[in-house]
UniProtKB/Swiss-Prot annotation:
SUPFAM superfamilies: Class II aaRS and biotin synthetases, tRNA-binding arm
Pfam families in UniProt: Phe_tRNA-synt_N, tRNA-synt_2d
Residue intervals passing through the bilayer: none
Chief location category: cytoplasm
A biological process term (GO) from this entry: phenylalanyl-tRNA aminoacylation
Protein name: Phenylalanine--tRNA ligase alpha subunit
Reactions catalysed: tRNA(Phe) + L-phenylalanine + ATP = L-phenylalanyl-tRNA(Phe) + AMP + diphosphate + H(+)
Organism: Laribacter hongkongensis (strain HLHK9)
Amino acid sequence: MSHVDTLLAEGLAAIAAVQDLNELEQVKARYLGKTGQITELLKQLGKLPPEEKKAAGATINVAKQQFEAAHNARRDALNAARLEAQLAAEALDVTLPGRGAGVGGLHPVTLTLERIASLFRSMGFEVADGPEIEDDFHNFQALNIPADHPARAMQDTFYVEGGNVLRTHTSPIQVRHMLANQPPIKIIAPGRVYRVDSDATHSPMFHQMEGLWVDDGVSFADLKATLTDFLRRFFERDDLQVRFRPSFFPFTEPSAEIDVLGKNGWLEVGGCGMVHPNVLRNVNIDPERYTGFAFGIGLDRFAMLRYGVTDLRLFFENDLSFLKQFN
């Protein structure tokens, strides 16, 4: 049966030479498949004389068992090698530093508020604060807003229990500060305010900053100089053109709208004026002795201008992919 020994030797050599499982299965099929060489030897046993069949069958079965044992051993070795390679590729280096936690950032409106507050602090203004739910006196009466003024209408103001309102401006902060302090007064009052309005450039909740300067001899010239300097520093343009258009506000007289000249023409950025004498009287400040100016700007609008955002609602939809670009 030298032929069987030769065939087994060739099969074992073929098994030892394979480098992947697919190739190993092909070798197995070549020897033990339906038409495999060892399988064919088993099929030919029936043609042998009875006296030779038993010995030949035993020899072929031994060869088959040796082939299967070699095949199984090689298969296990290839599987082990594949697993080792996979583990090596996915190995963790425990000496490497860990991944840092994600770092948050400030909201673009907050960044704008801090920038504006910093500019006014450099001009001697202090930051004042107050409640967001106000009574009628602080939100309307003290500011010379009569009972029949349109600003008191339900379509413009959020009314809450007890006749109170969600403040429609940060002017009540100024009222509270003037009631608690005598001139000189030089403050800015940033904060959230509320009005019944909602579209691409308006929100029912938005951020406003108002300013107030009350002292001996404060004039409209001081108002223009202060706001012109602020706007040029905020927009980082020393040649920025600023104009003041006559307007009307019940709490200032005279009053003006503030415009800046942009690429597409004049753009309104706020309102201002000299504090109305009635407002000074309402907070126990003598208008015969003191004068002052006040102004108001929309922080959200300034954030839109600074960052080139055209839809105000994007700031408050909590879309991190949008907000992260400002960090």
